[in-house]
Amino acid sequence: RAYMTENKKDSVIREIDEPDVFLWAIWAIQQYAKEAGVERAKELYAEFVNEILEFISGQKHPDMKVMENGLVFANGRDKAITWMNSTINGKPVVPRSGYIVEFNALWYNALCFYTELTGGIPVEKYDKLIKAMDTSFQDTFVNGYNYLFDSVNGSIVDWSVRPNMIFAVSLPYSPLTRVQKRSVVDIVTKELLTPKGLRSLSPKSEGYRPYYVGPQYERDLAYHQGTAWPWLLGAYLEAYLRVFGKSGVSFAERMLISMEDEMSLHCIGTIPELFDGNPPFTGRGAISFAMNVAAILRVVDLLKKYNAE
C-alpha cells in the first residue's frame, strides 16, 4: 500500500516496484481463499485486491500500462522487470518488453478472481477488460505452431520456447481454450521438461546455454538461457493436472521422485536454486531455495487433494 499511495520502496520486499509483484500478491490471496474460503478472503482482502486493480488499471504503475485491448504492456527494454532478471553491465540478458505472456496471464486471472470475491457480481470496468482479453490474449500470444509467444512488442515478437507460457494454463482462470491449454502443455513437455524442473529456454532455440558454470559473466549468460528451475515444475504439474485431471496424478507423482532423491544431496532435506539443463542435471546456485521448496510442497498438497477425491 505504501508503494501504491506514496511510491515508497520497501526494505523487506525486494523489487516491490516490479510489475508482477502486485499480480503475484493477488495470486497469493487466491491461494488463501482456497484454504480459508472465499468469504473469509473477501472479508480480509477484497478491498486490498481492488486497490491493486485500481492502481494498475488507473495507469499508476511506472512500468506497466493497461492498453485498450485489456492487455498490460510493460516497459522492460532497458531494465529487467520479470523473474528473468539477470543483467550484464546493467542490461538484461533476456530483455522482455511489451506484452509479456505471464504478466497478462496473471492480470486476467486477477480480474476474474476479483469477480469471485464480489460473489460473481461483475464490476463493469473489470468485466469489460476480461471480455476484451478473451479475444486479445489469443490474438496476441497464440501462434500457428500451437504455443504462446513469450513477449510481443509491436513488430518485435519473441518466438523462443520458454516456460512462462505455462502460467496461462496453471492459473485458475485462463483465456485459453482446452485445446490450446493441451497444446501448451505438450510443447513444454517436449522441449522444456527435465527431471529437475523446466528449462528456461528450449534446446532448439538460439542462445541455449544449459550449463551454469564458469565465471560470473558466463553464469549470468546461462542463468535464464537453458538452466532448469524446480519452482517452474510446480506450475507445470498444476497445469498438467488441469488438463488431464485425475488421470495425470500418477505422472505427477513420478515427476516428484527426482526431487525426493535430490533432498539427499547437496544441502540435506532441501532443493538447490537451479540445475543444468542437460544431463546429468547437476544442481547449481544456492544450495537451498525457498521458491523451489514451496512449489514442490504445493504440488504434494495438490496431489493429496486429487487422491482424496
Question: What name fits each language-model region?
Answer:
Residues 1-16, 76-99, 150, 214-223, ...:
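Acidic/His metal-coordination segments adjacent to aromatic residues that form catalytic metal sites
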Residues 269-273, 304-309:
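C-terminal non-catalytic interaction modules
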Residues 1-75, 101-104, 108, 229-241, ...:
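Aromatic-rich carbohydrate-recognition surfaces in CAZymes
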Residues 30-55, 155-176, 223-224:
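Short, charged N-terminal helix-start/capping segments
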Residues 9-12, 86-97, 104, 157-195, ...:
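Aromatic (Trp/Tyr) and acidic
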Residues 34-39, 140-144, 175, 243-248, ...:
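Secondary-structure transition/capping motifs at alpha-helix termini
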Residues 1, 57-69, 73, 99, ...:
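Catalytic cores of carbohydrate-active enzymes
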